[in-house]
Amino acid sequence: MSHGTELDAQLTGGLLHGWQERNRRATIPHAIAELRKAGNLENLRRLADPSVGPYRGRYPFLDTDLYKTLEGLAYEVGRDDAPAGARAFYDEVVELLEQAQAEDGYLNSYFQDPDQPKQPWSDLGWGHELYNLGHLIQAAVAANRRLSDGRLLTIARRFADLVVRTYGADGEEVVDGHPEVEMALVELYRETGDEDYLTQARLFVDRRGRGKLEHTIFPGEYFQDHVPFRELPSVTGHAVRMAYLAAGAADVHLETGDPTLLAALERLWDDMVATKLYLTGGLGSRHSDEAIGDRYELPSERAYAETCAAIATMQWAWRMFRATGRAKYLDVYETVLYNAYAVGLSADGTAFFYDNPLQRRPDHEQRSGAEDGGELLRRAWFGCPCCPPNIIRWMSELQDHLAVARDNVLYLGIYADARITANDLTVKVSTNYPWDGEITLTVENAPPEERTIALRVPAWATEANITPAGEQVDGWAVVRRTFAAGDVVRLTLPMAPRAHGVHPYVDAARGAIAVARGPLVYCVEQQDAAAPVDDLLLSPAAVHAATVREQDEHLVLDLTAKVAHPPAAELYPVISEQTTQQPIQQPAESAVGEVPVTLVPYFLWGNRQALAMRVWLRTEREY
């Protein structure tokens, strides 16, 4: 499948547009203030003026948080409603980078700092120098495309050229401890046409898996450096690293057509979706090493599901869609977007989750903390703040992932109020998705030749309807004709609440059900249930009978659940030293009484008082 032609897409209303407005109004100004407070700018400034003070921060890769923010700003500062102070911040950082860059092109505020014990390129396993470069390149390409500002691109190319000279085909065979530069180098090739960057990206993909990083404090599997990429049997290791590496490999395939890469990517993707991805689209089940677990190892309350891993999964999904045209990749993209990604940001746009569990215990506040199950509620910033600026840049770019045009076909994959132009065809998309399942396309301008409009039918939409009548092929509803201004294409998706079961191998949720409506996963917070959430018993029938109600501009689900009696806490007491050798003989559990319960979209949980939460609820049994 070809890359496709250029298209112009703008969000004009609805939930995603509201998220972008919040990003401009609240999240970006908040991030700028936090970056200033944390010392990210001062770390660059002190390279020219050591009197500024010592290096600020614990990690050697903090420049990346500036780069990700700059990438988001490249999309925002040119808008009429640009965030306050955004342009001044953008210009200030670019000027600092110009001043800080070494004569040979190297740029890293930590390793250039004369007070640091490590020298450039001395710690590729943990120094993240190429990872930083990757985010610099992505910011530079965005600025060149969106702002016609080539200053960052000049900086990025100087650094990238140094890497090609040092680690190219005739250079030292190394890889970075954190994949990211691979997809950035491919994007730099697309922007400049310089094939050296594409060659370098392919080299980095091909070199991984040769044990280059085994000497570090983490095993090779953590870095995906234990097995060559094409031979990986399963997604493994650090979740963000894994998905970034796969996205980079997908980019290399897109430009080279390497079938061995695509075969590996499809195998790894299918394994991940079938056995290692949470219902929310979250990736990474272990707090230890922020890692992907074994097949079906998907604990709810200990889920790590890092917000950055959600973004990396969307990056991989988008590239797989572009490589194959298959709707299943956008199904996962959409699930991640509305759940595992969106939950990472508070409703007011100024606080963040790093990890995203599917359950919180009632007593969690007594033991909360990053080293013991993650944060209870979102935080304003982090010592390693990779997630907040990642959220910002992805939010700024959402319109670029609504559709793709190729071979006179407009593929509309993510639904939102928007206006899209491609191949002389302009359509206005009107919808209240994901709250409502009706998507209406009105043709505003059309060429005299035949065109095809393909609308994605999500896998959960078993009774979708399209008018005028078209064919449904491999997850797409397709209408082909010579369109004229005023023509309307309408897709209707079923939006009844659904009860989801779980694979029996997932011990952590066996015998439980979860609730979804459209692409949204729902959960119950303790403040919305008249009984302890751990004692609620839910049946599929109760889910199907749920009432949909608007609350604070979102749709919630009201339903009735039964309550276990005796409560689980009484039925299964904590075993003490006096009872360890005694068999537990308790009266049989029964269900008694019914209580009203309100389920809220998972992405909204944690915005109120810190109480218990569950996605997976115990199944009502026959008594």
Annotate the PLM regions.
Residues P448-P468:
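Beta-strand-rich binding/interaction modules
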Residues A48-L66, A82, K118-L133, R165-H178, ...:
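Solvent-exposed loop and edge beta-strand segments that line ligand/cofactor-binding
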Residues M1-D65, D91-Q112:
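Low-complexity, Ser/Thr/Pro/Gly-enriched N-terminal "stalk/linker" regions
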Residues A201, L265, D331-N339, G344-T442, ...:
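C-terminal beta-rich recognition modules with glycine/proline-rich loops and embedded aromatic residues
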